[in-house]
């Protein structure tokens, strides 16, 4: 799924708690059932079992130097932590978000599940479009960002590793900056959960290829290391 073939630090006590939400596939009718017992599957188990069939979405805000607020929308595939799509707008809407899903997921290459929060921006237009694509939505509980851990981790990485170190002037400058960062994220930034590989896997280079060289990325905020012949 997508064109991609992080170490996730999460709160253990939260991810091991019983799955209690009606939106989880396969557990309808088990919540508050006749036995009064919660279902046995945990949230972590659901995420692990469906990693190959699951994408998540989220918005985050970025203020500019003139105090204008920009909204960034991301779509992330869980299996390889691969960013499938991002876009920036100053006026998000349900229709706009729905169009982003179409651009992120080409026809015939859609996941089974979409994990998202309950933000009002995901209105009827968004839900209708996603349903029409054959995707089943899984909603997190109110005020529970830990239930969307991969998207939250990605957004945290963007802030810590990029946005906290720069000044955003306008929408164009933010797009350029995010393009640079996401190129680094996909092709160079290693993830412990992927065996210290980036989302787009890199082959191990043997010593005979040459000396290790340092290549600046994201305007010098980060670096990539490769072997190259002298």
What are these regions (language model features)?
Residues 1-230:
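Charged DNA-binding/catalytic regions of mobile-element recombinases
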């Amino acid at each position: 799924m997508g064109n991609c073939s992080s170490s996730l630090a999460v709160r253990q006590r939260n991810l091991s708690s019983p799955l209690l939400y009606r939106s989880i596939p396969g557990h309808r009718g088990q919540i508050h059932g006749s036995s009064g017992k919660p279902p046995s599957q945990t949230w972590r188990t659901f995420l692990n079992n469906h990693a190959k069939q699951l994408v998540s979405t989220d918005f985050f805000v970025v203020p500019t130097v003139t105090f204008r607020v920009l909204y960034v929308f991301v779509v992330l595939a869980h299996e390889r932590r691969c960013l499938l799509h991002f876009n920036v707008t100053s006026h998000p809407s349900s229709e706009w978000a729905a169009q982003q899903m179409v651009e992120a997921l080409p026809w015939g290459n859609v996941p089974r599940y979409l994990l998202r929060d309950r933000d009002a921006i995901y209105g009827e237009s968004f839900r209708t479009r996603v349903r029409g694509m054959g995707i089943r939505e899984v909603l997190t509980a109110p005020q529970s960002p830990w239930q969307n851990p991969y998207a939250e981790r990605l957004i945290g990485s963007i802030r810590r590793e990029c946005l906290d170190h720069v000044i955003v002037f306008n929408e164009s400058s933010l797009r350029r900056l995010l393009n640079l960062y996401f190129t680094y994220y996909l092709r160079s930034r290693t993830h412990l959960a992927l065996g210290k590989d980036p989302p787009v896997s890199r082959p191990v280079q043997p010593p005979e290829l040459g000396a290790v060289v340092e290549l600046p990325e994201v305007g010098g905020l980060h670096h990539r290391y490769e072997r190259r012949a002298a």
